């Protein structure tokens, strides 16, 4: 079986000001761009290694605008662009032309699986990585948590990722169970697609899923995969897909998941 790795990661450093008179808010900063490029290079070196020319890349990022306002930045989409640019540079350093490097990215608008023979659109998959709608649909709950914890600190984020109290404010607001389900469904789709695609095209596959800390943390906490309660900028975990299971690792390759070769359904499954 060829190598298949899925990197679930938070977006990079951005201008998190809420001053709506500043149109640079929500955009990845120059420091953030450098950090993303450096992190991507390290990831490629560690995860892909000398198999770069025999690897197909798929990058899917959250479509969310900062403050849900189209005037401002889309930090996950911008992280995707920097990530892709760095991978392109790595490929060209291997002697590939611009067009040859581009051919190493899966760019079709859908992926196809046995579950979804008509295809699942990349846009639908992007939506599963979106920032939780709690900020728009239950702002009073967010304000209550801020008061309870004295701001948006570690206690705030831990409760946001684990409590279903938000449903008391708006039943349509996404709670931890909703977010876990979205990430689970996304992972199930891309795992199945990557296995089929890798086999049919005889290629290694490396997938970047770029999202928000609030979206990925409920999945991690519920599966008891690690001590992580909060992800820093561009931090994430790696799913190493095997024929008979999935191994999950942190960025520094400390093992945090169930024992190797655990069946897919145990780690992913459906809530």
Model-derived features with residue positions:
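Active-site-proximal flexible loops/turns
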Residues: 18, 78, 123, 128-131, ...
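Active-site-proximal alpha-helix that buttresses catalytic centers in soluble enzyme cores
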Residues: 1-117, 166-177, 181, 226-252, ...
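Low-complexity, serine/threonine/proline-enriched polar segments
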Residues: 96-174
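Acidic, His/Gly-rich catalytic cores of divalent-metal-dependent hydrolytic chemistry
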Residues: 254-271
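Active-site-adjacent alpha-helix immediately C-terminal to a catalytic or transition-state-stabilizing loop
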Residues: 20, 181-249
């Amino acid at each position: 079986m060829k190598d298949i790795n899925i990197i679930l990661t938070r977006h990079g450093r951005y201008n998190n000001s809420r001053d709506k008179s500043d149109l640079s808010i929500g955009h990845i900063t120059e420091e953030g761009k450098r950090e993303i490029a450096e992190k991507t290079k390290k990831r490629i070196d560690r995860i892909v290694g000398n198999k770069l020319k025999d690897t197909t890349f798929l990058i899917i990022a959250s479509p969310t605008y900062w403050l849900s306002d189209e005037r401002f930045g889309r930090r996950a989409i911008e992280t995707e662009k920097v990530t892709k640019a760095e991978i392109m540079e790595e490929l060209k350093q291997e002697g590939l032309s611009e067009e040859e490097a581009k051919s190493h990215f899966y760019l079709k608008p859908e992926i196809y699986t046995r579950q979804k023979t008509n295809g699942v659109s990349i846009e639908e998959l992007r939506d599963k990585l979106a920032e939780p709608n709690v900020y728009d649909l239950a702002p009073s709950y967010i304000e209550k948590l801020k008061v309870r914890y004295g701001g948006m600190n570690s206690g705030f984020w831990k409760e946001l990722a684990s409590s279903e109290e938000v449903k008391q404010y708006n039943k349509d607001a996404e709670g931890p169970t909703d977010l876990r389900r979205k990430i689970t469904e996304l992972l199930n789709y891309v795992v199945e697609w990557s296995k089929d695609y890798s086999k049919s095209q005889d290629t290694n596959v490396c997938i970047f899923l770029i999202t928000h800390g609030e979206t990925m943390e409920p999945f991690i906490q519920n599966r008891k995969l690690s001590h992580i309660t909060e992800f820093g900028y561009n931090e994430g975990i790696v799913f190493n897909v095997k024929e008979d299971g999935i191994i999950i690792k942190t960025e520094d390759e400390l093992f945090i998941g169930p024992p190797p070769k655990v069946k897919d359904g145990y780690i992913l499954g459906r809530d």
